[in-house]
């Protein structure tokens, strides 16, 4: 209780310097100024804390491969300077007068969505990621609720968001590991439940990285029999430790034999160019394959119409993160069942190095930035 009171007192003391004269919120973060993965400090402002908004002081921010694709201009033209980060965990520092979901001092998170039209059929169903007007993303989105300003992400000290689009983080959550759940967690949780995977099902995960190792944990918890497909021998031990019954090195032709028509469900998390037909052929009749990996545009995998004909009643579908209600459901489930990403905590002055390691395939699962180190990164950059 004393810690909470001290936190609130501190927020009151700094409030006069936190807000610009027009009510906008000063923020500082680490930004890319070109497609080269190099970060420098950036001071900017976020929109004012409205009646239905909360201000979150960011504690941890995950690094997603999507951040890198966007920063490197690999999906669509990027507006620089660019502050990435859509896996955000922190503490509520201020609430608008109409806010009921949060109070100052609560833990709160932000995933990939910070707003949407709220009026279309998808939004009314809690499927905000499919908003007919377009979801407003955590970064590099035109925020049509706030004069079309370009959103900046969570590699920063704070974020302003509508309470409706913020996720409640349970008090007992492991804050150092919770942030990636808000993207990697829901991205894999959603299709697994959409396809109604159940105990005893024979399933596969293609790609054992940030997304893949989350998928394995959810599938194992459900009691499914999981086979993992990846490119190297280096991840075989990790596959076993995570609970997989088998590991297949796709570069070993001997191991690939006998895999066709074997699985009722496959989730592909591969963020590079590959042949999806190889995995479709591994499905049983009526089996389903969910594609969640998002490579750079030039590496997008394709399937011809004839390949789909020969898929023979096997289903292939894409899955995009999850809506706000499902994200909350996923987070509550994950914390209750101790399902977390395996992370490496890094200081803010190591983002350059972390990006390069992800690009080079040298990261095992997930990097998380300790945003308490932001001030030190800013000071060291000025030297």
Regions from the PLM with identified roles:
Residues 157, 164-166, 170-252:
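Mid-domain Rossmann-like dinucleotide-binding core that forms the NAD(H)/NADP(H) cofactor-binding site
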Residues 195-202, 225-315, 374-383:
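Glycine-rich cofactor phosphate-binding loops and adjacent beta1-alpha1 units
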Residues 1-22:
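Bacterial Sec-dependent N-terminal signal peptides
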């Amino acid at each position: 209780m004393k810690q909470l009171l001290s936190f609130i007192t501190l927020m009151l003391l700094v409030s006069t310097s936190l807000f610009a004269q027009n009510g906008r919120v000063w923020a500082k973060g680490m930004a890319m100024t070109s497609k080269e993965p190099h970060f420098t400090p950036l001071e900017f402002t976020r929109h004012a804390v409205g009646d239905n908004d909360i201000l979150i002081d960011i504690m941890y921010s995950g690094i997603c491969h999507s951040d890198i694709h966007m920063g490197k201009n690999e999906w669509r033209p990027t507006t620089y300077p660019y502050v990435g980060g859509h896996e955000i965990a922190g503490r509520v520092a201020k609430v608008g007068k109409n806010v009921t979901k949060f109070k100052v001092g609560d833990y709160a998170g932000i995933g990939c969505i910070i707003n949407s039209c709220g009026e279309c059929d998808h939004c009314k169903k809690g499927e905000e990621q499919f908003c007919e007007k377009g979801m407003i993303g955590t970064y590099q989105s035109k925020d049509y609720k706030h004069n079309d300003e370009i959103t900046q992400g969570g590699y920063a000290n704070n974020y302003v968001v509508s309470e409706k689009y913020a996720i409640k983080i349970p008090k007992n959550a492991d804050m150092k590991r919770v942030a990636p759940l808000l993207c990697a967690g829901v991205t894999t949780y959603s299709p697994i439940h959409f396809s109604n995977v159940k105990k005893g099902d024979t399933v596969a995960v293609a790609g054992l990285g940030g997304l893949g190792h989350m998928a394995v944990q959810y599938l194992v918890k459900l009691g499914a029999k999981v086979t993992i497909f990846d490119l190297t021998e280096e991840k075989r031990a990790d596959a076993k430790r995570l609970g997989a019954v088998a590991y297949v090195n796709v570069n070993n032709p001997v191991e690939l034999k006998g895999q066709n028509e074997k699985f009722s469900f496959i989730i592909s998390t591969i963020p590079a160019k590959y042949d999806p037909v190889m995995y479709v052929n591994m499905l049983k009749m009526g089996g389903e394959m969910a594609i969640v990996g998002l490579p750079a545009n030039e590496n997008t995998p394709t399937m011809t119409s004839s390949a789909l004909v020969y898929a023979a009643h096997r289903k292939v579908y894409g899955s995009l993160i999850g809506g706000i209600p499902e994200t909350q459901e996923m987070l509550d489930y994950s914390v209750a069942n101790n399902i977390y990403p395996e992370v490496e905590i890094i200081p803010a002055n190591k983002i350059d190095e972390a990006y390069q390691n992800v690009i080079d395939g040298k990261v095992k699962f997930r990097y998380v930035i300790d945003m308490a180190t932001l001030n030190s990164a800013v000071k060291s950059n000025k030297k």
